[in-house]
Amino acid sequence: MQREPGLSNGWFAAPPPAAFRDFAAHYRRTYNANPPRIATLSYDAISLMALLSDGRPYDRFTDRTLTDPNGFSGVDGLFRFHDDGSAERGLAVLQVAPSGFTVVDPAPKTFPSAGF
């Protein structure tokens, strides 16, 4: 992307880059290989299942716990599930620069409340 003149200074939404760098460094130390970019999705899914499995036996994987409006924090940032089955992510806004990507607006740490 950095070499494409039409994208120079363009903005796009993406997971926070620092978290993936940390994840990738740990992965390389452990497996002596670079992780596929989508490895964080699997990691976050398993982490969520581990978190929910620690809950009360009758309330572990219910619609209510899976659609917690506060969401969950993963390697790729904040995410939550809605009643209709869709997912929402808290993404950063990055800018394309010749030297790489710069963060224009960091990813949110929490979702805004649904109240008015």
Locations of regions flagged by a protein language model:
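Extracellular/periplasmic periplasmic-binding protein-like sensory domains
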Residues: 1-43, 56-57, 107, 111-114
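Segments of small-molecule ligand-sensing domains
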Residues: 31-103, 115-116
